[in-house]
C-alpha cells in the first residue's frame, strides 16, 4: 500500500507541475501579443484570482474550515500580494512581449530564488556554494536575455519584459515563503484557498469593472479559464497532495521538469518552434537549481519543501 501511495503521489506531483507549466503558454494565449492583443493583463490577473476565489470559498464552506487566527492574516496577505497579484500580473505583461519558451528559461530560477529569499526573510544561513549557484543561474539568465535581445533587434541590452519576469519570480518566491509560514497550522490546500478568498474584495469587483468591451478570441477565454481554474487552484491540490503522499523530497524533484514542459506545451498551443539554444539554457539553469537545492539543505535533515509554480 505504501509503494502504491508513493507512486500515486509521484504522479500527482507530475500532474501538478504539468498544470503549472502550461500556465505560461496559456497566459500568452489569453493576453495575446503586442501586435494582436486579447485580454488585458490587469483583467486576466484579477479575473483568474476571482475565479479561483469563488472555487476556494465553496471548498472552505464545504469543508467547514475555520477562519485563520489573527497572527496568520499578515502572512496570508503577503501571499496575496505575491502569488495572487504580483506574479500573474507581471507575467501577463511580460508575455505580451516575449514568447512562452523565453519566459520558461527566466522563471526556471524560481526554486533557487525562493531558497535565496527564504535565507533572507527567515534569516537562515546558506552555504557559499549555494550563493555561487545562485549567481551562476542569474548570469545564465542575463546572458540568455542579452542574446535574445540581439536576435529581436533590440541590440545589446535587456528587454524590459525580462525585468518584469525577474520581478515576477521574486514576487512568487516571497509569496511562497509567507504562505509556508502558516501552512503547518492551516494545511497547504487551505492556504491557497484563503489566499484566493482574501483577494476577492479586490479581484471580483475589479474583474467586473475591467470586463472587456471589445470582441475577444475564443482561445483567449480558454486561456483565461485555464489559468483561473488549473494554474491558480486545481494544480495546487494535485501538487500538495502529491507531496504528502509521495514524500516532499522525492516529489519536489518533479518541478525540475517545469521549464521543459512549458517549452514543449508552447509548440502545439502557440506554434512556437523548438529552439536548441532555449532548451540548452533551460537545462543549464535547471542544473544550477539542482546544485543549489542540494547545497541549501541543512546538514541535519529537517527541511521544509516549498512548491514552485
Regions picked out by a protein language model, each given a short descriptive name:
Residues 56, 126-148, 256, 265, ...:
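Hydrophobic transmembrane alpha-helices of multi-pass small-molecule transport proteins
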Residues 13, 17, 46-47, 84, ...:
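Helix-helix packing/entry segments at the starts of transmembrane helices
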Residues 34-86, 113-114, 170-178, 192-210, ...:
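Transmembrane alpha-helices of multi-pass small-molecule transport proteins
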Residues 5-10, 37-46, 68-74, 131, ...:
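Juxtamembrane helix-entry segments on the extracytoplasmic side of multipass membrane proteins
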Residues 34, 59-60, 64-67, 91, ...:
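C-terminal transmembrane-helix exit sites in multi-pass transporters
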Residues 10-13, 71-80, 126-138, 186-195, ...:
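Cytoplasmic-side transmembrane-helix entry/capping segments in multi-pass membrane proteins
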Residues 1-46, 54, 89, 152-181, ...:
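Glycine-/small-residue-enriched transmembrane alpha-helix faces in small-molecule transporters
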Residues 19-24, 57-107, 143, 228-246:
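Specific transmembrane alpha-helical segments of multi-pass solute transporters/efflux pumps
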Amino acid at each position: 500500500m505504501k509503494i502504491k501511495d508513493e507512486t500515486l503521489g509521484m504522479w500527482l506531483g507530475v500532474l501538478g507541475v504539468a498544470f503549472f507549466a502550461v500556465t505560461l503558454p496559456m497566459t500568452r494565449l489569453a493576453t495575446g501579443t503586442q501586435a494582436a492583443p486579447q485580454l488585458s493583463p490587469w483583467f486576466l490577473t484579477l479575473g483568474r484570482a476571482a475565479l479561483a476565489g469563488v472555487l476556494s470559498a465553496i471548498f472552505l464552506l464545504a469543508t467547514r474550515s475555520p477562519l485563520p487566527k489573527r497572527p496568520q492574516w499578515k502572512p496570508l496577505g503577503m501571499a496575496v500580494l505575491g502569488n495572487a497579484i504580483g506574479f500573474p500580473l507581471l507575467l501577463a505583461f511580460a508575455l505580451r512581449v516575449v514568447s512562452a519558451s523565453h519566459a520558461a528559461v527566466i522563471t526556471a530560477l524560481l526554486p533557487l530564488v525562493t531558497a535565496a529569499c527564504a535565507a533572507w526573510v527567515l534569516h537562515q544561513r546558506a552555504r557559499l556554494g549555494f550563493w555561487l549557484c545562485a549567481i551562476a543561474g542569474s548570469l545564465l539568465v542575463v546572458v540568455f536575455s542579452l542574446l535574445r535581445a540581439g536576435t529581436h533587434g533590440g541590440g545589446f541590452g535587456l528587454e524590459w519584459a525580462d525585468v518584469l519576469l525577474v520581478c515576477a519570480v521574486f514576487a512568487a518566491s516571497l509569496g511562497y515563503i509567507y504562505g509556508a509560514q502558516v501552512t503547518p497550522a492551516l494545511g497547504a490546500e487551505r492556504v491557497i484557498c484563503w489566499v484566493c478568498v482574501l483577494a476577492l474584495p479586490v479581484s471580483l469587483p475589479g474583474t467586473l469593472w475591467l470586463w472587456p468591451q471589445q470582441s475577444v478570441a475564443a482561445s483567449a477565454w480558454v486561456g483565461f479559464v485555464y489559468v483561473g481554474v488549473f494554474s491558480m487552484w486545481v494544480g495546487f491540490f494535485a501538487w500538495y497532495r502529491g507531496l504528502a503522499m509521495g514524500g516532499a523530497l522525492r516529489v519536489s524533484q518533479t518541478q525540475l521538469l517545469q521549464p521543459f514542459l512549458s517549452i514543449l506545451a508552447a509548440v502545439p498551443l502557440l506554434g512556437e518552434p523548438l529552439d536548441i539554444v532555449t532548451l540548452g539554457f533551460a537545462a543549464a539553469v535547471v542544473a544550477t537549481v539542482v546544485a543549489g537545492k542540494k547545497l541549501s539543505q541543512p546538514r541535519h535533515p529537517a527541511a521544509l519543501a516549498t512548491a514552485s509554480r
